[in-house]
Design a protein with these regions (language model features):
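An amphipathic, aromatic/His-enriched active-site/gating alpha helix that lines ligand/cofactor pockets
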Residues: 57-87
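Short S/T/G/P-rich N-terminal loop/turn motif that feeds into the first structured element of a domain
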Residues: 1-33, 38, 46-49, 88-100
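A short linear hydrophobic-aromatic micro-motif
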Residues: 36-43, 78-80
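Short, well-ordered beta-strand segments in beta-rich or mixed alpha/beta enzyme
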Residues: 4-9, 43-66
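Short N-terminal micro-motifs specific to bacterial/archaeal maturation
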Residues: 19, 53-54, 80
Length: 100
């Protein structure tokens, strides 16, 4: 499974309905399985981004479908990063080192 980190920004519509934010997030967590995705973390944040969503997916296509679902109501926008754990990073960097 691949890990993804999505940085969440509320839209103007999302800000208007901010009192529903926790309920929306709960619904998203419950619906994730329909897309082959497991949500492993949800955080509301201060600063440039309003929240962080961390999830695992077996394929990029599953992650993309899930994110389209998350943003489809127009409440939030996302900026998503593919994340690597230390074992994966080690493997990637060893390949780089062996190329030289």
């Amino acid at each position: 499974m691949a890990t993804y980190i999505s940085l969440i920004t509320e839209t103007q519509l999302g800000e208007t309905h901010i009192d529903e934010s926790v309920a929306r997030a709960t619904r998203i967590r419950e619906e994730a399985g329909k897309f082959g995705v497991t949500v492993t973390g949800m955080y509301w944040t201060m600063g440039e981004f309003d929240g962080v969503l961390i999830f695992d997916a077996g394929k990029d296509e599953e992650a993309a479908a899930f994110l389209h679902h998350v943003t489809s109501k127009g409440m939030v926008r996302t900026r998503t990063l593919r994340a690597f754990d230390s074992d994966s990073a080690r493997s990637i960097l060893q390949k780089v080192a062996n190329k030289e």
